[in-house]
């Protein structure tokens, strides 16, 4: 490993999953103040006033951080849904909040629903502080069993050309819709449910939810992130992009996210799925992500994830990861949890060595992708699996390409913290010329 001081410092070790001494049942003991367990549907926000980072999650639980590496629980950020929401839904559940600041007002968009039904609504709560408390203002949209969609999982996006504000939302059934908001009130600016911009076929139960749209000023595209599959086992994160906030959103193969002809589960550019490095925790169902384009221009993706257990889904936890961009404008997600690392100039000598690599291949159902060994040699040859006729080269200070047969893999190379082996490392994150994402780390 390189001798240069390029690596992040050792982070605080993650708090262990709380369990009863006997084994399987989750403890009812209060969570450690730095625990990320039970964080679900995390929405990331960097407050320009306090300078602190916040995460808002299902259950109205809040987290706060100075650096996105160490987090502290701050308790409930809002109390109960408004009466008109409760009267419609019949529960006080608060799911999947998302936040936006308009003027001096912080606006939290919360979902009120019960699992597996369409009797749902999204309501707005407001505060003069990022940490709340948020006070309900009113219902934005609601659905019931007679509707073709489900009103949960809100995210707010602004049109960079005209300043109009939109709410993208939806879960299963009729897919993901986008609805214009009244920027003055934060409530709906139009009747109805808006426009469908993504959906899934009936064979997979229409399993799409957790939409999140961000705009990249460098590529001048809006990017729609959403989760496919089941939150309890095979969640995976897909991406499509559009020049217009209203779509159409097309994937890496120019397929529309509303296209129902997807028998092989390949529509949508997959940036994360269940994975396992050797000697590390096997993770499944990364999903319901949010994205942060920070004040310094850096990009991050935040999502919940579970430890592998296909028999009984355990509690979720939260991962924050650096996000980079390919040369043709697609997001690339770090294979390791964020520890404060920055991109630095690297040499070929830094990069030479033994690696584990993971190919994030779409499958039905979406399984856990397991790492395989790879070696990058000083003579610019490489090998992995049964492939020996492989070459590689650095194409920039922190970019690399790997070639074999008719395949070309493009990578970002960056320092990181190896959370499996608990040591500094280099990671590679990239995609091949077929649009399949790849992860790797140096041993």
Predicted segments, located by residue:
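Carbohydrate-active catalytic/glycan-binding domains of CAZyme proteins
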Residues: 1-443
